[in-house]
Amino acid sequence: MVPGVPVHAIQRGNNRAPCFVDDEDRAFFLHHLGRLARDESCAVHAYCLMTNHVHLLLTPEREESCARLFKRLGLLHTQYTNRRYRRSGTLWEGRFRSCLVQSDYYLLACYRYIELNPVRAGMVAHPGDYLWSSYRSNAEGTMDPRITPHAEYLSLGRDQYRLLFGRHIDPDLEREIRATTNGGYALGAEAFKRRMADFLGRRVSKGSPGRPSRAGSQETMEPKLF
């Protein structure tokens, strides 16, 4: 991870099995998410707990912050689940998947992508109807001690943020978010990807193995919010 650069991360249940059975399980996870995120210097901007996976939008202060957060939170929730349901073994599917996110249009798209998960899954008609995401905090102002608003969100403002949900996310952008997250790439313009590749010393977009060439790269024009 790159300190100060937002991350969209997803952690799935092992074999895509449920990792939350009821609201008590979800409340336990969220309580410790807030505590451990503070411990590991990760700012939580958005989240959504689905039945068999979790989405988080984070900004780590240190390179190891996200990995330590997921390791500690995953272990704690596994121990809790195994005790409560008298089971054994792993709960989660290996390492979490993630992408680096450029702090502009792409970041706000990830906010919405995360908070619209229950709508896409057909669980609710409106994101505000789902209790286990950050939508009510980010769009409606409900107090949530886990949430640290990103500067990009603050510059937009809550009312304008809420209006974004009146439009669908572009399907191509949805696919890009999924692909970059599953592939461990970077989500953003070409200049952002070059900076991330230089910092990490590895490729952060699809292509042949090895460090990407800087020759011929061009900055792409950012899509408009509205």
Each model region followed by its residue ranges:
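Short Pro-Cys-Gly-centered "Cys-loop" motif that presents a nucleophilic cysteine in a tight turn
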Residues: M1-M50, T59-F226
